[in-house]
């Protein structure tokens, strides 16, 4: 479309496939006030996060199209594909112009967003074709959103929150399935007998789950502050459970999986599995430490039954980060790694210095399960991987 391709490629999903033409929507986790990506007349605000839409030909192994499909949003981290073929792009940054007089807290002290013109911290819906009409889905909450996964049978959307020390795991029950802007109920998970889910978990130990209502989903800040924990604090006050730094979220075969990047005994991350029918929750993987695979982030379920896990490493190890797999039996294995010998330049970046330390993100499969698409977050590019896959769980 003539616009520069943004950097910081993060969450991504396949929203359509017709024959060999696969359409993907890709997030860009940018957070600078200035000129929005794409057409400024179609942007939500004056920050530079958003999405691009890619069309890839699997028969030819070639990229056919690349265009901006959402602009003017803040720190678009992950999201999720809806059952009706759109992409939900989630803002991980929370901001309100009405609170500009209060001092920023935490990471926001270092972000260049003080001149942002709009409210941020919401979910936006992006169509497979054209450019999104940038309307926040306020009923889904104003918080540090990460990922979304749908139970297509019920229409319920499940969401993770990437905040610390207080993060929630949420579900949104839409008033009208398929029409999220019609509103609905936002609820936060309560693990019975476990108000703190950040540590002390055992592999395979099942926990009963309940849900508490969030009275005011649009209250993104703790009262009188710019601390972006207003929604989580409402849930905690009603008895919900506290998680930390929740990341990826995936739904398949009636169950849901989600990750915590820094939870667990080693504060290096874990993966949970949830049964919404039985209302049970249990841990299926826990990182053994920051010298091992750590910081589990974006996830997707392979059509062959294995969970694909992107690494956002928590240590200073300079070897390339990995994409891993988890079998239904709980066996963990590494699938691929950023090549530490990677060289050359891309968009002004020395890849040997930039890409090697980058996280993986955006894992998603083509509808036929033959192609796996992944992003290398920095400097921001997408790879397409094909099989043969038949001999393994991925």
Please state what every model-predicted region is.
Residues 1-394:
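Sequence/structural signature of beta-propeller domains
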